[in-house]
Design a protein with these regions (language model features):
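N-terminal charged helix/coil linker that caps or initiates catalytic domains
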Residues: 1-30
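Glycine-rich phosphate/adenylate-binding loop
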Residues: 2-3, 116-120, 125-133, 140, ...
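Hydrophobic/small residue at the entry helix of a nucleotide-binding pocket
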Residues: 37
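Aromatic pocket-lining residues of Rossmann-like dinucleotide-binding sites
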Residues: 45
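Glycine-rich phosphate-binding loop and adjoining beta1-alpha1-beta2 segment
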Residues: 50-93
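A structured beta-alpha segment of the ubiquitous adenosine-cofactor-binding alpha/beta core
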Residues: 78, 82-119, 125-128
Length: 264
């Protein structure tokens, strides 16, 4: 390690032990989805001394991202999120290597995009089929992976938890992901209604989501006749706040750093 690295990240060494710094500097982490949750993961990982990041996302910054996403600034509207974050990483730690992949991960490119021997893969996308695809591919290759539940509609950052995917409760996004993994990828099913450990860590909220209503009000109950499968998107769907999406990202990053720092 050079002097600039130890100056920047000596505080991390005093938190996890000096022996952890070379491991963090040598680590390569992929973040799939760098929006409301993923952008904060990138921020936390580069500030924790991770030496190489692969950022995977095809979205551009939109003005409606302002309430929840790190790259959303007045001068970045319309710019690739991956490019904005890569530039930010370079300002934080110029020695951090960043691989920019301006693509959405799909069935047709998953083998190529997840081909490197990543030390960790972080799933921060909000489509069930793609979450299951990422998890299944990493599981089959022996790549450590962690996945995020839904941050949309939540107000309370203190309700965020980390657990095994098989024990993640009623989070609808993770519940659908579990079902997809069991149906399409032969993951173990629950036994007599009891959760089965899946060896996949996940971050989720125990808070009930707040639903937006057409009249501008919000409720813990979905509006009659309205779409129930709301997503966190730019113009409609669940609302979101940075203090929740950021906390999701930081909890995910904390678990990645904890595991990487402990690996001999």
């Amino acid at each position: 390690m050079d002097e600039s690295y130890t100056q920047r990240f000596g505080g991390i060494g005093r938190l996890y032990g000096a022996a952890a710094l070379p491991r963090l500097q040598a680590a390569h982490v992929a973040i799939v989805g760098v929006g409301g949750v993923g952008s904060w993961i990138v921020e936390a990982l580069v500030r924790s001394g991770i030496g190489e990041l692969t950022l995977i996302d095809m979205d551009d910054v939109c003005i409606t991202n302002t309430n929840r996403q790190l790259p959303a600034l007045a001068h970045t509207i319309g710019v690739s999120k991956v490019d904005v974050l890569a530039a930010r990483v370079a300002e934080i730690n110029p020695a951090c290597r960043v691989n920019r992949i301006v693509e959405f991960l799909t069935e047709s490119n998953v083998d190529r995009l997840l081909a490197p021997n990543f030390d960790f893969v972080v799933d921060a996308v909000d489509r069930t089929s793609i979450k299951a695809l990422i998890i299944a591919k990493c599981h089959s290759r022996g790549l450590p992976v962690i996945t995020s539940g839904s941050a949309g509609g939540r107000r309370d950052p203190t309700a965020i938890r980390i657990a095994d995917l098989g024990h993640a409760g009623a989070d609808p996004l993770l519940r659908s992901t579990r079902q997809c993994l069991r149906r399409d990828y032969n993951f173990a099913k629950s036994e007599q209604g009891r959760p089965v450990t899946m060896d996949i860590p996940c971050v989720f909220s125990t808070e009930k989501p707040v639903f937006p209503w057409a009249d501008g009000s919000c409720s813990l109950e979905p509006e009659s006749g309205a779409e129930t499968g709301l997503r966190l998107d730019c113009a409609a769907g669940f609302g979101a706040a940075t203090f929740v999406t950021g906390t999701f990202g930081f909890v995910l990053a904390a678990e990645v750093v904890r595991r990487l720092a402990a690996v001999e």
